[in-house]
Amino acid sequence: MIFNEYEEFCKKMDECIEKYKGKFGCIVTFNGFVREYDLKDGEKVPSKGMKIDEDILEKLKLVIEEAKNKFDVIDILFYHNTGFLSIGERIASIAVFARHRKEGFEALEYIINEMKKYH
């Protein structure tokens, strides 16, 4: 499930914890923020922020479905901010509910790597 409002993501996290109680062994999470610099050719270059188009949300829905099909996980929640993001702003939050940490971490790594293709 994908969200473009962080508060909705947090609310759904709480709901899923109750819904899946006893079924999951871990929730593997990731939170990404805009850095004050970018790396270009190994050099630190000051950042002015980043712009994220709303069409990324549709692409990320597909990534989530792919991850659910590829890895043995219970559920995936994904928040992604859009518009112009300033330094320090949250870009994305991901929560993978899994029976075991191995599958949870593998699914999370896959999602992050796919997400980075669109940034």
Curated annotation (Swiss-Prot):
Gene3D superfamilies: Molybdopterin biosynthesis MoaE subunit (3.90.1170.40)
InterPro entries assigned to the protein according to its UniProt record, in alphabetical order: MoaE_sf (IPR036563), Mopterin_biosynth_MoaE (IPR003448)
GO cellular component, one term: cytosol
Superkingdom per UniProt: Archaea
Pfam families: MoaE
Protein name: Uncharacterized protein MJ0717
SS bond partners: none
One biological process term in Gene Ontology: Mo-molybdopterin cofactor biosynthetic process
Family: To Synechocystis PCC 6803 slr0903.
